[in-house]
Amino acid sequence: MDAKIKPLRAGKSADARTDFQPAELDPSEFLAAAVQPDQPRPSRAEAEAAVKTLLSYIGENTEREGLLDTPRRVVEAYDELFQGYHQCPAEVLDRTFGETAGYDDFVLVRDISFTSHCEHHVMPFYGKAHIAYTPVERVVGLSKLARLVEIFARRLQTQEHLTAQIAAAIDEVLKPRGVAVMIEAEHTCMSVRGIGKQGASTFTSRYTGMFRDNPAEQARFMSMIRNRG
């Protein structure tokens, strides 16, 4: 298959791209729970009724024995799969430790497994996240980075948005010298439905601070992710 390279838009030069800066996220996306206690929401009974409607839509008999409890089970599963809407990312990163003996290199946690759901088809995508940050005097507990991934993953997402949210939360709360996030994932909306290409992986990355400004640090981050020796 031949690739077609689109020309730059009129008035744009290739050099202009080097000045690109990523868009800033709204802090409400990563500093607080997505659902507030006083936010109006459908009742549990209404949610179960909606599941029953979908079962009827696909042609099922919702009164048969195997489906009698399915609406309840689906809503309970949603409560678990999407609990990230009720959790606060900033609180996870709030506790830090200052006993670092002057450590001044980046901290990397790789292979953080996760499962999320695509906001376009509500189908799972899953994979691994790799996170590095260069602390300023204080560090956060390593498990907190995994917990942060879990909170954002348990919401409807795109992989690009998930990557950006993780980086933005670390950058804003910890205020390190730089953050690097890479996510690799397989999307069932592409492998199970649609084009049906199993095994295809999608990679996304986001860099801030020293990682964004220094290609050598990006390269070292990537090397440490890939080096399994």
From Swiss-Prot:
Q: What class of enzyme is it?
A: hydrolase
Its recorded reaction(s) are: GTP + H2O = 7,8-dihydroneopterin 3'-triphosphate + formate + H(+)
Query: To which pathway does this protein belong?
Result: Cofactor biosynthesis; 7,8-dihydroneopterin triphosphate biosynthesis; 7,8-dihydroneopterin triphosphate from GTP: step 1/1
Return the EC number: 3.5.4.16
Recorded GO terms, molecular function? Answer: GTP binding; GTP cyclohydrolase I activity; zinc ion binding
Tell me where the transmembrane regions lie. none
Residue positions annotated to bind Zn(2+) are 118, 121, 189
PROSITE patterns hit by this protein: GTP_CYCLOHYDROL_1_1 (PS00859)
Quaternary structure (record): Toroid-shaped homodecamer, composed of two pentamers of five dimers.
The family note in this entry says: Belongs to the GTP cyclohydrolase I family.
Q: What is this protein called?
A: GTP cyclohydrolase 1
Show the taxonomic lineage: Bacteria, Pseudomonadati, Pseudomonadota, Alphaproteobacteria, Hyphomicrobiales
